Amino acid sequence: MDFKRKLLIAALPLAFCVSGLAQAEVKIKFAEVHPAGYAPVVAEQNMGKKLEEQSKGEISFKMYAGGVLGSEKEVVEQVQSGAVQMTRVSLGIVGPVVPDVNVFNLPFVFRDQAHMRTIIDGEIGQEILDKITNSQFNMVALAWMDGGTRNLYTKKPVRQISDLKGMKIRVQGNPVFIETINDMGGNGIAMATGEIFSALQTGVIDGAENNPPTYYQHNHYQNAKFFTMTEHLILPEPIVMSKATWEKLKPEQQTLVKKLAREAQMEERALWDKSSADAETKLKAAGVEFITLTPEQKKAFYDATQPVRDKFGAPYKDLISRIEAVQTNPALAANNTQAAQ
């Protein structure tokens, strides 16, 4: 046997070994519509780093932030097909496919942010994740990100509910959100996040609704200087993985992904609270007026949206009662108070 043949035979086991490693590797593309530096994006990137390290290189992770892979709806379709492996998705998009999640989409269903966090950390939060996983959505729901408390921001001040009458307000394309704004007296306009800035600039809309970090990061304050603290929605948002990708993972890899997603859930809320406080400070410095409602003024928004809760919450009365009965975790309530200071 000549030297070259011996060398080839000797190299075969190594070649098979390398080939096996290449086949075992799972490559994860994580798509985000939000920009780099946004609290959920930071927590998701940290999750990815841990995933690469703790899987010993069997799983690779790359973040695509800032909507470079498309709008949220487009990204969801890519995750469903397996072209993108993971994302964080708004429940406004999930709701039409998995109706149960619309319970979390109902206006004023949570008393405050601490109450919402208590819910998603517990039994009800896991039940909703399971509903998403077991639906036709074609994704595995792993954990929750805090999507913040949504308020109105407008070109003209909204100091009481009557000021909203006739205003065109951008919302996500979910009937619950559209009817919420309509019942408040405005005109809910479904629109992708990336279209809001120009729509405000050109007068296509009079305002939108979201949390302070999103309002700041997307520069919407440049065209809408009034931020009214309605707190009408407090929305958690799930981290999801394509079912096709999930089924490629070994059981121990699935366990690792779930563990790290849960860790990201806890890390993100600390990042969120800081970014929310920082955003509010920067927005005020940029000339934004934050309008705080009296209890009576806020109740007017609550009462106006009762038909939405009655209509969309009717099939889930028992679940809503369970949510209302949950007592806020005292530690979360304390953290919430500190963040607000």
Report residues per predicted region.
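N-terminal secretory/targeting leader peptides
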Residues: 12, 25-116, 123-124, 130-341
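Bacterial Sec-dependent signal peptides at the C-terminal "C-region" and cleavage site
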Residues: 21-23
